[in-house]
Amino acid sequence: DIRFEGNLIFTKEYAVNVINGLVRTGRIPKNARQDKNVSAAQNFGPGLKIIRKESDALVLDVKQNRYAQDILTFISEKGADGKPIKVDALYKNFIGINGPNGKNYGLTRRMVQIYLLALAQEGKISIHLGPKSGLSEDPIDYSSISGTDFNAKTLDWLHEVHLAKHP
């Protein structure tokens, strides 16, 4: 399902750029300054199925993304009682073959991270970092994600997720 236009190769570095260019902020205004993050989001967002065009911006949207929705369903089922889900369990189930319900997802670690952070941006989940991340103990969620500058180290310390609690 995931196909990129032209001869672009989706690398771990581009994944970090996509997160900082679109997922972190939730939108790219039409007149946004072109930098490596915005370019990566524009180049890879459509293939990752995380982007929707509006008249004045490109907007993060994973509502129609089967991978993000299947990840959310997995979190909802396993964490229904408020129990956190280890990010490693998500990697185990969505990277490679033999995932939930016999599906072969074949996602990369960075793709799983993009979808998790997109779900956090949309207010569906919160993500806790491991103790050695060097960042705040506060979870990453819709209220804090835009203030986080993501890099490879941060992404590698995604530790566990919780379903969002809404008032």
Task: Name these PLM-found stretches.
Residues D1-P167:
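Extended alpha-helical interface modules used as scaffolds for assembling large macromolecular complexes
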